[in-house]
UniProtKB/Swiss-Prot annotation:
Name assigned to this protein: Uncharacterized protein L330
Species of provenance: Acanthamoeba polyphaga mimivirus (APMV)
Regions that span the bilayer: 1-21
The keyword Transmembrane helix is annotated on this UniProt entry: yes
Cellular component, GO annotation: host cell membrane; membrane; virion component
Length: 265
């Protein structure tokens, strides 16, 4: 039996139509859910507030209760914090140090520095610290210093700048830079009823901050040496006197040039 072409085409079309109907029936159905609106979110947010006003609290938003001990500590902190905030911050305006080892409150050291830097303080050693402390203890008890260890004839006056020593230069002497051409001369009377004086000079070779004081104890005045000059002093010097054998300048000679004495009218 022979089929013509038209019959075959009709059969193919019918089979394709059945296939399309079958495929549409077997596809999954998609259900579209409605999108929530903003008004719905607002109503959900307002629900806890409305429940609080109505007296019905949501158990999920209830805060945990504190134990009695924690509650007391919180109350104490709340009471302390306002008082602390109201109290003013202390300000340090003055600092006063009182200690035996403080160098700025040591009167003995202050006196040592003063005697070292002051050119009008006679060069001499002070008493040991333990002796000076005994002096102070005696003064605190009796109101006066003890007589032991004091000179029976103390210095009558403080040292003064009496004049200068001018270096004598010989023609054959080589030039030296470490010997100054002039040196300040200081003197102080040994005691009130004496005609002897203590003399000293200041080392100015290097122009340092600390100028050393050199006592003139072993000098020769016009070729004459005086014994025990460190205890009793030497006779008063006058203009034109020649001094040599100074400990600082042993090979040099100096002539004395005194300042004029000011006379009151």
């Amino acid at each position: 039996m022979a089929f013509n072409n038209s019959t075959i085409i009709i059969i193919i079309v019918i089979a394709f139509a059945f296939f399309l109907i079958y495929s549409q029936n077997n596809q999954p159905k998609i259900i579209q859910q409605p999108v929530p609106q903003i008004s719905q979110f607002k109503s959900q947010l307002n629900q806890p507030q409305n429940s609080q006003h109505n007296g019905h609290l949501n158990p999920s938003i209830i805060s945990p209760q504190l134990c009695p001990k924690c509650d007391k500590e919180n109350c104490s902190l709340e009471q302390i914090s306002p008082s602390r905030s109201k109290s003013p911050t202390p300000q340090i305006t003055n600092v006063h140090i009182e200690h035996e080892s403080d160098p700025y409150s040591d009167p003995i050291k202050k006196q040592d520095i003063y005697g070292m830097m002051d050119p009008l303080t006679f060069p001499q050693q002070r008493l040991p610290r333990e002796v000076l402390q005994k002096y102070q203890e005696y003064y605190d008890k009796n109101g006066s210093y003890p007589p032991f260890g004091q000179n029976t004839q103390p210095l009558f006056d403080n040292p003064v700048l009496a004049g200068i020593l001018i270096k004598q230069v010989d023609e054959n002497e080589p030039f030296t830079d470490n010997v100054p051409s002039s040196i300040p001369l200081f003197k102080v009377k040994s005691n009130k009823n004496s005609n002897r004086f203590f003399y000293y000079i200041i080392d100015q070779r290097y122009f340092s901050k600390l100028e050393l004081k050199i006592p003139l104890d072993s000098i020769r005045v016009n070729g004459v040496r005086y014994n025990n000059a460190e205890f009793y002093g030497i006779p008063e010097l006058f203009d034109g006197d020649v001094i040599d054998n100074i400990a600082l300048y042993p090979s040099n000679r100096f002539s004395v040039k005194l300042y004029k004495i000011y006379s009151f009218p």
